[in-house]
């Protein structure tokens, strides 16, 4: 199964990629991830607070990684053809490489925000690896029915992650500074809503039931990716919650703390 991945580099040409209707969404995703990376880099240049620096480093790395993976898909290096149902079906495996690195970084942002213990962080990262890994196995599986078995395992791992965010992390956030609690709740809600949509898109897309065509699936994943990475970062890095208590600047019209959301 995994031997399919090198074939993608050799067997898919630039002409084949640009001739696909999803090409425009990959180009847009590449541009938005690149712009997000540059914005976070510039915004973080004048930051001196040690706590804020950690958040800037992690949060900037997220769209930077996504940019490289979207670029690889755009140029045809992140695509493979998987035979099932009597057809050759295009699967963008680079999407999973993106998620494998970026999703634990997003979880690390949330964990640092609420000062989570190391054991909880390791458990979340482990569950995240299972979530992404089994999703990739499902996407590359040639037996159609087995795809949904792997999807179910991946979704179960995601539900565990969201459970920890909604219950374990929320109780920790509520005992912290008001700006930390309010920012965490906004980011928690954004993460829960967006991450919950991923298995739905997977299920109806080319990896699953094939209800929607690949170009629509690519559009949906691109919107989710940009929102979950760049959108997440914009909320986090505009909040005073990332600064140490002594360093937190006064809120302004453009840089206020995130609004409280339950």
From Swiss-Prot:
Sequence ranges on the Extracellular membrane side: 14-22, 76-92, 141-147, 205-216
Pyrrolidone carboxylic acid PTM positions: 14
Species this chain originates from: Halobacterium salinarum (strain ATCC 700922 / JCM 11081 / NRC-1)
Taxonomic lineage from the root: Archaea, Methanobacteriati, Methanobacteriota, Stenosarchaea group, Halobacteria
Keyword Membrane assigned: yes
Compartment(s) where it occurs, according to its Swiss-Prot or TrEMBL record: Cell membrane
GO BP terms, alphabetized: phototransduction; proton transmembrane transport
Primary proton acceptor (site feature) positions: 98
Function text: Light-driven proton pump.
Name of protein: Bacteriorhodopsin
Assembly notes: Homotrimer.
Bilayer topology term: Multi-pass membrane protein
Modification(s) after translation: The covalent binding of retinal to the apoprotein, bacterioopsin, generates bacteriorhodopsin.
Gene3D superfamilies: Rhodopsin 7-helix transmembrane proteins
């Amino acid at each position: 199964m995994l031997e399919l991945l090198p074939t993608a580099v050799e067997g898919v040409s630039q002409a084949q990629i640009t001739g696909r209707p999803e090409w425009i969404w990959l180009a847009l995703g590449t541009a938005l991830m690149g712009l997000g990376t540059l914005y976070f880099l510039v915004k973080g240049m004048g930051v001196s607070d040690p706590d804020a620096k950690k958040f800037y480093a992690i949060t900037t790395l997220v769209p930077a990684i996504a940019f490289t993976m979207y670029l690889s898909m755009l140029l045809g290096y992140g695509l493979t053809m998987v035979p099932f149902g009597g057809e050759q079906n295009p699967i963008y495996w680079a999407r999973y490489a993106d998620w494998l690195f970026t999703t634990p970084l997003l979880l690390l942002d949330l964990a640092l925000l609420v000062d989570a213990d190391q054991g909880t962080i390791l458990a979340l990262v482990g569950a995240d690896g299972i979530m992404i890994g089994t999703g990739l196995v499902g996407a590359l599986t040639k037996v159609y029915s087995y795809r949904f078995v792997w999807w179910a395992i991946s979704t179960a791992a995601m539900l565990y992650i969201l459970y920890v965010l909604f219950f374990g992390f929320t109780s920790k956030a509520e005992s912290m500074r008001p700006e930390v609690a309010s920012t965490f709740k906004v980011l928690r809600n954004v993460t829960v809503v967006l991450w919950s949509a991923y298995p739905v898109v997977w299920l109806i897309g080319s990896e699953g039931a094939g209800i929607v065509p690949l170009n629509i699936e690519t559009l949906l994943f691109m919107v989710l990716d940009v929102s979950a990475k760049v959108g997440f970062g914009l909320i986090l890095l505009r909040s005073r919650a990332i600064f140490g208590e002594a360093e937190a600047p006064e809120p302004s019209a453009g840089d206020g703390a995130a609004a409280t959301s339950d």
